[in-house]
From Swiss-Prot:
GO cellular component assignments: cytoplasm
One of the GO biological process terms: L-histidine biosynthetic process
Cytoplasm found in the keyword field: yes
Subcellular location(s) of the protein: Cytoplasm
UniProt record similarity statement: Belongs to the imidazoleglycerol-phosphate dehydratase family.
Predominant cellular place of this UniProt entry's protein: cytoplasm
Gene: hisB
Record protein name field: Imidazoleglycerol-phosphate dehydratase
Amino acid sequence: MRTAEITRNTNETRIRVAVNLDGTGKQTLDTGVPFLDHMLDQIARHGLIDLDIKAEGDLHIDAHHTVEDVGITLGMAIAKAVGDKAGLRRYGHAYVPLDEALSRVVIDFSGRPGLEYHIPFTRARIGDFDVDLTREFFQGLVNHALVTLHIDNLRGVNAHHQCETVFKAFGRALRMALELDPRMGGAVPSTKGVL
């Protein structure tokens, strides 16, 4: 089983993340940011990874530090659970619709962090959630999971639908990239021999 648990404490947040990359989509989520919990649920269910996330942050200021630091800590946990990437499919992609919204996510477990992020949100907030924090979450995750990630919302009118299709597509792309390919024979999927 590819599992990891990371605890990350700063002056702004205290976060514990446990992941099982070979799970069934079970989740226990308590970040103090309800919309973030809803989006993390999409990653777990559509990625078929088990997530246990507990976060305490300076929400009396705003959700920025909590959302970003959850992304950072989740990225660290994914990187630890993936290990040396032997036998990994490495690449994953998904298109996901939700009514009028459609998003595409492509991921590469390259060892090189990079984020291309294109979501033209139709409003600035989804309930109490500042949509700018979506980028902060994924930037933190990318930097610490050491992945290249392309996120494109291709169309959408409802900002909730735009965001949800991105997180669902991320979960599905992650699931594909994390699969172990028996034809690889345990080799690392790179001509370099390492990732």
